[in-house]
From Swiss-Prot:
Enzyme Commission identifier(s): 3.5.3.6
One Pfam family this sequence matches: ADI
Protein name: Arginine deiminase
Major site of localization recorded for this protein: cytoplasm
This protein's record includes keyword Cytoplasm: yes
Active site per database record: C397 (amidino-cysteine intermediate)
Stored InterPro entries: Arg_deiminase
Keywords: Arginine metabolism, Cytoplasm, Hydrolase
Keyword Chaperone belongs to the record: no
Gene that produces this protein: arcA
GO cellular component terms attached to this protein's record: cytoplasm
Reactions it catalyzes: L-arginine + H2O = L-citrulline + NH4(+)
Length: 407
């Protein structure tokens, strides 16, 4: 049986991808709430939607099937029993296990169609949306100035992070910050209950862990090699955990853990390092030292289910050995210029989405990086980016590959 998920590289021809079109959740961001919701600016929704539609159409024009996260979720909740279970879990993860507020939220959301319910949960439920005759103590004693009963999910258009397709399976991720943790609950229901996926997908690591990992840090370099960022959003123990699972149950035998700065500008590995061809990568120069090196650790299967760990600094040498390539071409964001590079990296100049070997989708605003990619023989499809980029994520962040051709 052919698996509905199949991703054995970052660069194999992209056949199917999952996106989320930004919705009214974006309009629930205000300056006072940006930090809690992990934003540092507020996109203008109508233009963000136009830009996202242009991005989706760019992918379709290359023959790529585009699925939508919110539609898959609604289809996964077609069964009344599944919908009830999902709703109880979502409300509990929003802070209400029982009580009048829990019951009011349940009644308010349950009377909607599955699509309306999913859209509203992502949008967020304001206190003014529901008339609670007698609020419980929890509601009146906590966050009295906070306007939401259920927080919005404005980061949902970055579909890369709640999960990651690896081989014929998936990791359903425990995300780092509360603002995003409920997104992967939606993923769990898609994988377990959507007819396209249910019972057909290996879950390499589920979301029921204390340690965190996010899809922006998970790069599938080949059919047996992963690179994973040790970052603000992904912990070392989570990397060891998923490595053990993959070594035991899959063809993967190498995980390269790459250390990057733990800050918002470089929150994931794919904001500073992406694979764009068999032997070519984009890299933000700020993660490399004066010798062009970066701390990394190579994990392999050991005895009795354990793993071996080797420390390295020469990332080129590690990649050459792992990928069996005579040379590796690291293409610097912003051509390495001390002003251009951080500016374009801030606007996701390193966050390229490969749709085939040597063919990528990028934001048009990063014109220095795009010109350099073209000089290195890369075919570049530029997409509009004035509003989408305000969320600090680029084309790779906004896409979750479901199927790629093998190399």
């Amino acid at each position: 049986m052919t698996s509905p998920i199949h991703v054995t590289s970052e660069i194999g021809k992209l056949k199917t991808v999952m996106l989320h079109r930004p919705g009214r959740e974006i309009e629930n961001i205000t300056p006072d709430y940006m930090e809690r919701l992990l934003f540092d600016d507020i996109p203008y929704l109508p233009i963000a939607q136009e830009e996202h539609d242009f991005f989706a159409q760019t992918l379709r024009d290359q023959g790529i099937e585009v699925l939508y996260f919110e539609k898959l979720a609604a289809e996964a909740l077609a069964s009344d029993d599944v919908r009830k279970e999902f709703l109880n879990r979502m409300i509990a993860e929003s802070g209400y296990v029982a009580g009048t507020t829990h019951d009011a939220l349940y009644d308010y959301l349950y009377q909607m169609t599955p699509q309306e319910m999913v859209d509203k949960i992502i949008e967020g439920v304001r206190g003014t949306d529901i008339d609670i005759a007698q609020p419980d103590l929890q509601s009146v004693s906590e966050n009295t100035d906070w306007p939401f009963l259920m927080d919005p999910m404005p980061n949902a258009y970055f579909t890369r992070d709640p999960q990651a397709s690896i081989g014929d399976g998936i990791s359903i991720n425990k995300m780092t910050f509360p603002a995003r943790q409920r997104e992967s609950l939606i993923t769990e229901y898609i994988i377990n209950h959507h007819p396209r996926f249910a019972g057909q997908v290996e879950v390499w690591r589920d979301r029921n862990h204390e340690s965190h990992i996010e899809g922006g840090d998970e790069l599938v370099l080949s059919d047996h090699v992963l690179a994973i960022g040790v970052s603000q959003r992904t912990t070392a123990d989570a990397i060891e955990d998923i490595a053990r699972n993959l070594f035991k149950d899959s063809n993967y035998d190498t995980v390269i853990a790459i250390s990057i700065p733990h800050n918002h500008a470089m929150m994931h590995l794919d904001t500073v390092f992406t694979m764009i061809n068999h032997d070519q990568f984009t890299v933000h120069p700020a993660i490399l030292d004066d010798k062009g090196e970066v701390d990394n650790w190579v994990l392999h299967p050991g005895k009795d289910g354990e793993i071996t760990i080797e420390h390295h600094t020469d990332i080129k040498a590690v990649l050459k050995q792992a990928l069996n390539k005579p040379e590796i071409d690291l293409i610097p964001t912003g051509n390495g210029d001390p002003i251009v590079a951080p500016r374009e990296q801030w606007n996701d100049g390193s966050n390229t989405l490969a749709i085939a070997p040597g063919e990528v989708v990028t934001y048009n605003r990063n014109y220095v990086s795009n010109a350099l990619l073209k000089e290195h023989g890369i075919l570049v499809h530029e997409v509009r980016s004035s509003e989408l980029s305000r969320g600090r994520g680029g084309p790779r962040c906004m896409s979750c590959p479901i199927v790629r051709e093998d190399l």
